[in-house]
Each structure stands twice: as structure tokens, then as C-alpha cells.
Regions:
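Proline- and Ser/Thr-rich low-complexity, intrinsically disordered segments
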Residues: 1-246
Length: 246
């Protein structure tokens, strides 16, 4: 009389896996007293060679059932255990990005400056408190802002950053006025502007103007506009000089 060892598939088990995994061995779910070397199958009686699966092929929220059956020597009955796997989504925070805005510009969505295909719903942290994922140069400090998505275990959290810099718009100065005689010498309109106007702008007005010079003998009085542009992404800013002749 020969006594055979009855097969032991262990207890049913369930776990969650992250879909960032490309390889997972189901044998790790077996109890310590369960011998490996049996066969693994999933729904449809599909054989799983070696018990190794690829969680990344499944959509988030998918539930997949596997059966483990150790070899059963005659006349012992077969035994099996059911392993239920739930697939969870690995958060995608995208890739690092940069945002250059104008110091006087409107608020911008930092999410739009992340690379890749980031998931929505994360949280922002940085040098200033962030509301609604917006960067507002009027009230916030430039620097590195991090975007974080929390992962449900066993998935891990994911983070990326947006580095914000601010460009300072050029200053055209402040409006000025001047009254001249028709026989006065020519003068530079920039000298009439108040403040500290940036150099390199352009002048436009009732008469064509070259180099910012106004010549009472050949030019018409009126409002002359001084415009400076940039740097990118800042737009243009203007100031005026109103010329009167007596």
C-alpha cells in the first residue's frame, strides 16, 4: 500500500496590482506551504506559463481571476485555489515643463505647460500658494512649482514640475507735454518723457519722425507716441508727448 501526498493549492487570495508593472509572478501569492510547479490558468481556461502575467495590458479597474492547480498523484483528488487580481492605475503627472510669463501678464494654467499626457486632479505646491492650478504674476513668486498625483497602493505617487520665470516689460516712461516756438531748434522727444523710458523704441505722430527728433521748422505739432516692445512674451507699452507750437 502506497500513501500519496494529497495536493495542496492553499487558500484563495486576492490582491491589487498597479498597471505600471510589466511582469508579475502569481506564485508569490501562494502560501509558504504550497508547492510551486502546478499550473496557472485564467478565465477561458487559458494557460499562464510559469504563472507570470503582464498587468500593464489591463485597463484600470479590471478584475482578473486566476486558478492554481498543483499536480495531484492518483488516486488523490485535484485541489485548486482562486487568485483574484484587481488592476489599479499608476498616476501620470506628465513631464517637467517651463512657463515664461510677463510680469504684467494675465494668469496662466500651469497644467497646460506640463509635457506628456498628465492626469488631472493633482495638487500644486511651490513658492506661492496655488489656487486652481493658476500662476498669477500679479500676486505670485516665480520659481519651481510641483504637481503631484497620489497613487492608490500599491501604485506610487507621481510628480512633475513647472519652472516659472517672469519677463519684465520695457518701460516707455510717462506722458509729457512741451510748448515750442516755430523757430526753435530741434530737440529729442524722449527728453520730454517722464520717468525712465527704455531706449530703442519707435515714434509715431502727425509727422514722420527720425531718431525721436522733433524739428519745429518742418514738423506738425500734436500727439507723438513712443512705443517699446518686449521682451517676449511681454507686449508693447506706450507713452505720449504732446507738442504745441506758439
Amino acid at each position: 500500500l502506497t500513501i500519496q501526498q494529497a495536493p495542496n493549492a492553499g487558500l484563495d487570495n486576492a490582491t491589487s496590482l498597479c498597471n505600471s508593472l510589466t511582469s508579475f509572478n502569481l506564485n508569490t501569492l501562494l502560501g509558504p506551504a504550497v508547492p510551486t510547479g502546478g499550473t496557472w490558468r485564467k478565465t477561458g481556461n487559458i494557460l499562464i506559463p510559469g504563472g507570470t502575467i503582464n498587468p500593464s495590458i489591463y485597463n484600470s479597474g479590471a478584475t482578473v481571476t486566476y486558478w492554481y492547480k498543483p499536480s495531484a498523484p492518483a488516486p488523490c483528488p485535484a485541489d485548486s485555489a482562486i487568485m483574484t487580481i484587481t488592476i489599479l492605475d499608476q498616476p501620470n503627472a506628465g513631464t517637467n515643463g517651463t512657463l515664461t510669463t510677463c510680469e504684467s501678464g494675465a494668469a496662466s494654467s500651469m497644467f497646460a505647460y506640463l509635457g506628456g499626457s498628465p492626469d488631472a486632479g493633482g495638487t500644486w505646491n511651490g513658492p506661492s500658494t496655488v489656487s486652481g492650478g493658476q500662476y498669477d504674476p500679479a500676486s505670485m513668486i516665480p520659481g519651481t512649482y510641483s504637481y503631484t498625483l497620489s497613487g492608490a497602493s500599491p501604485c506610487v505617487s507621481a510628480s512633475s514640475t513647472v519652472t516659472v520665470s517672469e519677463a519684465i516689460p520695457l518701460d516707455p516712461g510717462t506722458d509729457g507735454t512741451i510748448t515750442v516756438c516755430g523757430n526753435n531748434d530741434s530737440f529729442n522727444l524722449t527728453d520730454v518723457l517722464g520717468g525712465t523710458p527704455a531706449a530703442g523704441g519707435t515714434w509715431n505722430g502727425p509727422s514722420s519722425i527720425s531718431g525721436g527728433t522733433y524739428d519745429p521748422a518742418t514738423m506738425n505739432p500734436g500727439v507723438y507716441v513712443y512705443t517699446v516692445s518686449g521682451p517676449t512674451p511681454c507686449g508693447s507699452n506706450s507713452a505720449t508727448v504732446t507738442v504745441s507750437e506758439t
